[in-house]
Regions:
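Short, amphipathic alpha-helical segments
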Residues: 30, 81, 214-218
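Local cysteine-cluster metal-coordination motifs and their immediate loop/turn environment
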Residues: 79-94
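Residues at the beta-strand->loop junction immediately N-terminal to the Walker
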Residues: 77-79, 133-134
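N-terminal [4Fe-4S]-dependent radical SAM core
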Residues: 3-76
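Conserved non-cysteine loop/helix-boundary elements of the Radical SAM core domain that shape
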Residues: 94-225
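Structural motif
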Residues: 73-75, 87, 169
């Protein structure tokens, strides 16, 4: 409403005209919302509740990202292809860290070189988000995690206020609670991570065992605590 009021002021509208403008805008937004919900129902046979939820989430996301300049802004994704164990349902490129631990250092060293190259190639654009996924990034040691995050901080100049202020998200996936340690949390805090993602998949211990997750529901609660 504040945004619409500013638009009205710029257009020289009086209070009545501005109110009518806001009403028309709201009606148009609701019309688009309803059309999208109906599309979900007609094409994908989605329930009303799920169609409404998906559309509302998309609208909220749009409000968050509409300020991003797609020509001059960019987001960085960093993949860490290691996990504590491989889940039975997983289709991602991922390797059990227990077997491939000796490869992790080589991977991180090589990744750091690639990050330096990417930073150089995109130094004319604005970095707005960093997402470190996998795999399970927190399956590597806290020492290697520190090497990675320090490199990101250095080559992308995250300590510079103008860069840090433009960063809307710095996420590290910590999808497996059995991979989270106080040392790793301290490293993430030190290097400016603003969000971690802990994904239990299920809180049913029997299901966790069946799908190959080497942790239980109690560990999930402990990780959040």
């Amino acid at each position: 409403l504040e945004y619409l009021a500013e638009q009205a002021d710029e257009a020289g509208m009086n209070g009545h005209d501005a109110e009518e403008h806001a009403d028309r805008t709201h009606e148009k937004q609701q019309e688009i919302h309803d059309r999208i919900v109906q599309y979900y129902r007609d094409i994908y046979d989605t329930s009303v509740q799920k169609a409404e939820l998906a559309t509302t989430v998309a609208e909220n996301e749009h409000r968050l990202v509409k300020g991003i300049d797609l020509d001059n802004d960019y987001c960085l994704y960093v993949g860490i292809p290691f996990c504590p164990s491989r889940c039975l349902y997983c289709s991602f490129t991922s390797y059990p860290i227990g077997i491939y631990a000796e490869k992790a250092k080589t991977y991180i060293d090589t990744l750091c070189k690639e990050l330096a190259y990417v930073a150089e190639q995109y130094n004319h654009k604005r970095l707005v988000a960093i997402y470190i996924g996998g795999g399970t990034p927190t399956s590597i040691s806290h020492e290697l995690l520190a090497v990675l995050l320090k490199q990101i901080q250095t080559v992308f100049r995250l300590q510079e206020p103008e860069v840090a202020d433009g960063l809307v998200e710095f996420t590290v996936e910590a999808g497996r609670p059995d991979s989270i340690t106080p040392e790793k949390l301290a490293v993430m805090k030190e290097y400016g991570v603003t969000r971690i993602s802990i994904n239990p998949q299920t809180m049913n211990d029997e299901t966790l065992r069946t799908i190959g997750r080497a942790h239980n529901a109690a560990q999930v609660k402990e990780a959040f605590a």
